[in-house]
Amino acid sequence: MVERALRKTRVGKVVSNKMDKTIVVAIETSVKHPLYGKIVKRTYKLKAHDEENQCQIGDKVKVMETRPLSKEKRWRLVQIVEKAQ
């Protein structure tokens, strides 16, 4: 039996939940500037599948890589780490 490779997971903040069963998650990373060496924050957004429409804007969520679900959706919600205030 062939084992599947571990899927990527990311933790980010929900910035939009206006689509049905879809959330937009902003992921913040820190990278070192190639020339100056300063640590710079980079933010990128990805769309994730939220089957029960349970996320609200501001929630901290964990998403996992999955098969393509639509043109731009390749991630799905694993859990809500922290609810928004």
UniProtKB/Swiss-Prot annotation:
A single GO cellular-component term on record: cytosolic small ribosomal subunit
Coiled coil stretches, renumbered: none
GO molecular-function terms, A-Z: rRNA binding; structural constituent of ribosome
Family of the protein in this entry: Belongs to the universal ribosomal protein uS17 family.
InterPro entries: NA-bd_OB-fold, Ribosomal_uS17, Ribosomal_uS17_bact/chlr, Ribosomal_uS17_CS
Subunit structure: Part of the 30S ribosomal subunit.
Keywords: Ribonucleoprotein, Ribosomal protein, RNA-binding, rRNA-binding
CDD domains given in the database record: Ribosomal_uS17
Function: One of the primary rRNA binding proteins, it binds specifically to the 5'-end of 16S ribosomal RNA.
Record-given protein name: Small ribosomal subunit protein uS17
Biological process annotations from GO: translation
Species of provenance: Ruminiclostridium cellulolyticum (strain ATCC 35319 / DSM 5812 / JCM 6584 / H10) (Clostridium cellulolyticum)
